[in-house]
Amino acid sequence: MEFNIKSGSPEKQRVACVIVGVYESRKLTFAADLLDRISNGFISDVIRHGDMEGKLGSTLVLHSVPHTLCDRVMLVGLGKERDFRAKEYREAVRASVKALTQTSASEAVSYLSELTVKKHDVEWMIEQATVVTLDALYRFDRFKSKQDESVREPRKLTLAVPRRSDLADGEKGLQRGLAIGNGMKLAKDLGNLPGNVCTPSYLGEEARKVAETFGAEAEILGPREIAELGMHSFLSVAKGSAEEARLIVLKHHGAKDKNDKPIVLVGKGITFDSGGISLKPGEGMDEMKYDMCGAATVLGAFRAAVEMNLPLNVIAIVPTCENMPNGNAVKPGDIVTSMSGQTIEILNTDAEGRLILCDALTYAERFSPATVIDVATLTGACVIALGHIATGLYSNQDSLARELLAAGEEVADRAWHMPMWDEYQEMLKSPFADMANIGGRPGGSVTAACFLSRFAKAYDWAHLDIAGTAWKGGKDKGATARPVPLLVQFLQDRADIALGNVVRRGRPRREAPEVADDEQD
């Protein structure tokens, strides 16, 4: 779909649909009020008769509104004005896009992006409208023999800004939103692919395509090179499958000084997780294709960063393989030596994500990173603790944790800081090796993070457990692309710091605009 930024009065838009908002108090937004006045109270009459109450997310499409040039006017409920914040704004935008796909309108102009959201500016409004729109329009129908013709994606969406002087900021927000949306689409596409398509080698080739498209560096290592690095923990998982392992390394040299310490993103890439010899139950095992969503979101965030050409050095590392139970598979009780030299007793082969991540974390040391963030669908225990709302966040630096929490809040991709006290480390003791790969059922998400922390002592490190947030089940089944928005916002914040800018946290914006004659298109 094509996006555009425009400043102009709603009644002068010769387009298939104009989108405006209505509050629950029946108060019209600035753009809706302009349409109401030009139509001699047509919209007010509709509201007065109770056809639109303004409840958040409700929509009503009006045809042939008098004295306007558009074919339709869509009214979107915004809820109570005093409660209208970032969350409500996103919900209203999403509702408008969903309703638009149920019409035959091929073009629309949305004035929701002109609304006032406390502490947020034009750039943020446009960015978020773009991200939400792309997310709402996303469909994964690659393997459908027939397309769903009941949903019609508009050809063009124009997002309105209050004044001509806002066009430049609006364009910045649009480009950021497109980059984030494209990164999310990549993450969702990779996550939704079946395991017989999205194999480790396929993931490696898709990563290479991203690098080639944006001029980044790509290095894809196979089993021989991985073994030469001493990544025997990683390979212990991979050897149970006929699919060969890959270690994907992508590099973006965006900083002025190419020697600046990079930010390293590490993503767990188990393209299918049967559990190995510690076999999972059959029910729901199909969803274990999503066990590579850590890898998918790291690649998605990397794609967004390079598309935005962030002035940072960013490296993505993805260890990827299958966890399968063939005759060569690792067994409970086996002991392996990690790349770091630390030995691991494998008590449960279904705790395999940490076994591939630990070697990737050791590998990251060679880049002398400023920060390392690993992302993984690591533990069911995190789902029990936090449900499907928040990502579990662990870190060896509280300041880094605060940065990530703030980034997540800014873009509605929330995380929660979990404890990682020394007492939990005791649960990983093994009588035969330096550590066991599990610490028992209690505190399973914490002990998994504690395990990883033993391989991340050389740098500032954070771990995002996305087992509860990476995908949805049920009727809305599919990958969510979380935490791509959080990661990209974090990278943008670090880029602002590198440039000496104040970290962008929703700069205050003007109140409802007054549209002057010379500002109308």
Curated annotation (Swiss-Prot):
Binds 2 manganese ions per subunit. Mn(2+) 1 binds at D273, D350, E352. The active site is at K280, R354. It is found in: Cytoplasm. Gene3D superfamilies: Leucine Aminopeptidase, subunit E, domain 1, Zn peptidases. InterPro entries: Leucine_aapep/pepB, Macro_dom-like, Peptidase_M17_C, Peptidase_M17_leu_NH2_pept, Peptidase_M17_N. It comes from the Bacteria. The keyword Cytoplasm applies. It holds the Pfam family Peptidase_M17. One of its GO terms (biological process) is proteolysis. GO terms for molecular function: manganese ion binding; metalloaminopeptidase activity. Its EC number is 3.4.11.1, 3.4.11.10. Transmembrane segments: none annotated. GO terms for cellular component: cytoplasm. Signal peptide: none annotated. Presumably involved in the processing and regular turnover of intracellular proteins. Catalyzes the removal of unsubstituted N-terminal amino acids from various peptides. Belongs to the peptidase M17 family. This is Probable cytosol aminopeptidase.
